Amino acid sequence: MNNYTYKVNFNSISGVRHARIKCPIYTKNTF
């Protein structure tokens, strides 16, 4: 269970990084 949640968190963090590269304005509004 902990490993699964860790993978989900890691994927979400990497997804946020890609989103910032694509559209930083959108991520600034969300975060």
Swiss-Prot record:
UniProt keyword annotations, A-Z: Translation regulation
Domain of life (superkingdom): Bacteria
Keyword Acetylation annotated: no
Induction, as annotated: Expressed in equally in both exponential and stationary phase in rich medium (at protein level).
One GO-annotated biological process of the protein: regulation of translation
Short name of any one Pfam family annotated for the protein: ArgL-like
InterPro entries in the cross-refs: ArgL-like
Function: May serve a regulatory role in expression of downstream gene argF; in an argL-argF-lacZ fusion mutation of the start codon to a stop codon in argL increases expression of beta-galactosidase.
Additional detail: This gene lies upstream of and overlaps argL on the same strand in another reading frame.
Protein name: Putative translational regulatory protein ArgL
Organism: Escherichia coli (strain K12)
Gene, per the UniProt record: argL
